[in-house]
From Swiss-Prot:
It comes from the Eukaryota. Belongs to the Mediator complex subunit 27 family. GO terms for biological process: regulation of transcription by RNA polymerase II. InterPro entries: Mediator_Med27 (IPR021627). Keywords: Activator, Nucleus, Transcription, Transcription regulation. GO terms for cellular component: mediator complex; nucleus. It holds the Pfam family Med27. Its main location: nucleus. The keyword Transcription regulation applies. This is Mediator of RNA polymerase II transcription subunit 27. The keyword Cell inner membrane does not apply.
Length: 293
C-alpha cells in the first residue's frame, strides 16, 4: 500500500509540473525583445523539461516496482461506469460509494443492536407463548354455491324486480337484476362479495358474454359509475349478507329513474340527463352536480 501511495503521489507531482510547464510556455517572455530575456525563457523551459523527464523516469520505476495482483479486481457492474460520458451520469460513482459506506454502517449498527438485545435480562410474556394466535378464517369467499340463491330469495323485492342467476365462472355467481322496464344490472359475485356491476338499458342485451361492455346510453353509464361508488360504500367483509341486501335495496331505488325530479333543484333533466344519483341513506334522487352543492 505504501508503494501504491508513493506512485500516486509521483503521478500527481508529474501532472502538476506538466501543467506549470505549459502555463510557462503560454505566458511567453515578459515583453522584452532583448537577447537576454529570450535566453532566460529558453533556460527556464529546459530546466522544467528536464525535471519532467526525470519525474517520468521516476514514475516508470515506481510502476515497475508495484506488485502484480494474482487476480484482477472484480468491480462488477461498476466497471461500466468508465464508459459513461454525460455529466449527469458521472456523479453516480461517488454516490454509489457513499451508499456502500452507509450500508456497511447500518450492518455494523444492526449487529451491535442485535447483541445488546440478546443480552437483555428482561423477559416478555410473548417469549414463552407456545401457541400463536391464529387469524379468524375469512369465510366471505368460501360459501355454499347456493348461498346467493337463498340470500336473494330472502330479500323483500318489489314485484317489478326480477333476478336471474347463472354461474359461468364455476361456483361464483352472476346475477342479472331487471328493474321494471327501466334498466338491467349484472352483479358479479366472488363468494358473497360484489366484485363488479354492469348497468345497461332495458332494451340492451346483457348476458354472460358481455358483462364488461358499457351501455350505449350515457344515462346508464352514469348510473354504472354511481353503482361502483355504492358498491364500495356498502362493502363489508364481516357482514357480507347485509351488504348485499343494502346494495340491492339501493339498486331498486332506480325504478323511477325517469319519473322523479331532483330533490335539490326540482328539475327532471339537467344537461340532458335525469337525476342519476341516489342518496346512499335516504335513496333520494339527485343530479350529479346537485348532490355536491
Amino acid at each position: 500500500m505504501d508503494k501504491l501511495n508513493s506512485t500516486l503521489t509521483a503521478v500527481k507531482n508529474l501532472r502538476s509540473n506538466v501543467r506549470l510547464c505549459f502555463e510557462h510556455l503560454a505566458d511567453g517572455t515578459d515583453g522584452e525583445s532583448g537577447e537576454e530575456s529570450r535566453n532566460k525563457f529558453v533556460n527556464d523551459f529546459q530546466e522544467r523539461f528536464a525535471a519532467i523527464n526525470s519525474q517520468i523516469r521516476e514514475v516508470e520505476q515506481l510502476i515497475n516496482g508495484l506488485p502484480v495482483p494474482p487476480t484482477p479486481y472484480s468491480l462488477g457492474n461498476t466497471a461500466y461506469l468508465a464508459q459513461e460520458t454525460s455529466q449527469d451520469r458521472q456523479a453516480l460513482y461517488p454516490q454509489l460509494v457513499n451508499s456502500y459506506k452507509w450500508m456497511d454502517k447500518v450492518h455494523d449498527h444492526s449487529f451491535l443492536a442485535f447483541n445488546n438485545l440478546n443480552q437483555n435480562t428482561l423477559r416478555r410474556s410473548y417469549n414463552y407463548c407456545s401457541q400463536k394466535r391464529q387469524r379468524l378464517p375469512f369465510s366471505s369467499f368460501n360459501n355454499d354455491p347456493d348461498h346467493i340463491d337463498k340470500l336473494l330469495s330472502e330479500i323483500n323485492t318489489p314485484p317489478h324486480t326480477s333476478y336471474r342467476i347463472f354461474r359461468p365462472f364455476g361456483t361464483n355467481a352472476v346475477t342479472i337484476v331487471t328493474i321494471s322496464n327501466v334498466m338491467k344490472a349484472a352483479i358479479v359475485f366472488k363468494g358473497v362479495l360484489i366484485e363488479w356491476v354492469t348497468v345497461k338499458g332495458f332494451d340492451e342485451p346483457l348476458e354472460h358474454d358481455d358483462l364488461w361492455a358499457e351501455s350505449r346510453y350515457e344515462v346508464f353509464r352514469k348510473v354504472q359509475d354511481h353503482a361502483h361508488s355504492a358498491m364500495l360504500h356498502f362493502f363489508s367483509p364481516t357482514l357480507p349478507d347485509l351488504a348485499v341486501k343494502s346494495y340491492i335495496t339501493w339498486l331498486n331505488s332506480h325504478v323511477k329513474l325517469f319519473l322523479e325530479p331532483c330533490k335539490r333543484c326540482g328539475k327532471f333533466v339537467v344537461n340532458g340527463l335525469p337525476p342519476t344519483w341516489r342518496d346512499l341513506r335516504t335513496l333520494e334522487p339527485f343530479h350529479e352536480d346537485c348532490r355536491n352543492c
